[in-house]
């Protein structure tokens, strides 16, 4: 029995990937497993989906190295910053990196020992990283850097998850213009721009889709969730246990600051999970959890390691299961955020329990691997 844990359903992740492939114009999938696979555990998930995807994408060098050391053999691309020192390590581990600045590329080319596979990052309107269209003359100069082997070029959409397709189409057209110019100058193998939202909503063609949030069964936005262009299965649940149940009287307060006071005699349950585990303090007095198929509202402030809920109308006892985020979209909206943030904030002290074909196949926690089948 586990106390605080994330249950991850491998079968659902695999089915989500196959469903995305069915509707996408691009059959090559790059699985985005940055931020520890959005909090769910990158190395374990990557092992189970490696045969379904063409690439893996991460945010930084340490994430990439972690995948490679764990045994992943498919290509890995870093989407964010890589230092000059880390670039040398990327050569050793066969990790691909983005190039988005000429002087930066020159420093890397001068520093590394051996050849390094790179992808040209293009800024088509997201204004994060990348060469802009008017800087094409600087892109051409990358041809002079003999150690940098240009394998791909990519960009990123800003509003692909919104109903208005105008800006997404503008970005795509800009990407295609640059692509045609690049084809005249380089022998580039892979052009990629589509994210989860673009892959399931937009009729856009490139060589590969980068799928992150949708792979884990979460729609990129409320709008896409309502459209239901594709059936995604949420592949994870955050669970805990009831640690204590007691009755309090009218006027009794709950938790720090006495922000909650009972208006009548009531029953509360304590759950041994708090903001140190990634259950946001912002859920104080507004969050909801599920106990024995009934909703229980958070009472008072969420503590570092514990949270109290109203179970006046729920028959429950110590060790009963608690499901946090019974509706992750609704809970995210309550505190003005998105499911992405709730997922990626899940702390490493939460045990990750992986299930496939109805059985536990792997267990991880911050103390190290506990079980693998």
Q: PLM features: residue spans?
A:
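Active-site anion/phosphate-binding pocket segments in diverse small-molecule metabolic enzymes
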Residues: 2-9, 14, 63, 82-84, ...
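Active-site-proximal beta-alpha core segment in soluble small-molecule metabolic enzymes
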Residues: 4-8, 12-15, 22, 27-181, ...
């Amino acid at each position: 029995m586990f106390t605080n844990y994330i249950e991850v359903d491998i079968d659902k992740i695999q089915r989500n990937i196959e469903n995305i492939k069915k509707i996408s114009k691009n059959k090559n999938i790059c699985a985005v497993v940055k931020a520890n696979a959005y909090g769910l555990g990158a190395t374990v998930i990557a092992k189970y989906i490696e045969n379904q995807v063409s690439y893996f994408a991460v945010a930084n060098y340490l994430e990439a190295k972690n995948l490679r050391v764990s045994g992943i053999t498919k290509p890995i691309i870093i989407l964010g910053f890589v230092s000059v020192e880390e670039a040398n390590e990327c050569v050793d581990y066969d990790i691909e990196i983005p190039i988005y600045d000429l002087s930066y590329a020159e420093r890397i080319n001068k520093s590394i020992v051996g050849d390094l596979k790179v992808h040209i990052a293009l800024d088509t309107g997201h204004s994060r990283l990348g060469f802009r269209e008017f800087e094409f003359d600087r892109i051409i100069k990358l041809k002079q850097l003999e150690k940098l082997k240009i394998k791909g070029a990519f960009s990123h959409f800003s509003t692909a998850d919104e109903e208005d397709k105008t800006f997404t189409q503008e970005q795509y057209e800009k990407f295609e213009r640059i692509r045609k110019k690049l084809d005249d100058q380089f022998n580039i193998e892979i052009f990629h721009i589509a994210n989860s939202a673009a892959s399931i909503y937009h009729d856009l063609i490139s060589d590969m889709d980068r799928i992150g949030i949708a792979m884990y069964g979460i729609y990129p936005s409320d709008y896409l969730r309502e459209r239901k262009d594709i059936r995604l299965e949420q592949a994870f649940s955050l669970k805990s246990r009831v640690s204590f149940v007691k009755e309090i009287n009218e006027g009794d307060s709950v938790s720090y600051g006495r922000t909650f006071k009972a208006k009548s005699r009531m029953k509360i349950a304590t759950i041994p999970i708090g903001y140190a585990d990634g259950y946001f303090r912002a859920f104080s007095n507004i969050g909801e959890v599920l106990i024995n198929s009934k909703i229980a509202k958070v009472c008072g402030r969420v503590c570092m390691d514990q949270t109290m809920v109203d179970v006046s109308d729920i028959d429950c006892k110590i060790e009963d299961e608690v499901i946090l985020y019974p509706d992750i979209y609704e809970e995210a909206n309550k505190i003005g955020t998105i499911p992405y943030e709730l997922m990626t904030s899940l702390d490493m002290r939460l045990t990750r329990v992986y299930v496939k074909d109805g059985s536990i196949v792997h267990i991880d926690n911050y103390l190290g691997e506990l079980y693998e089948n």
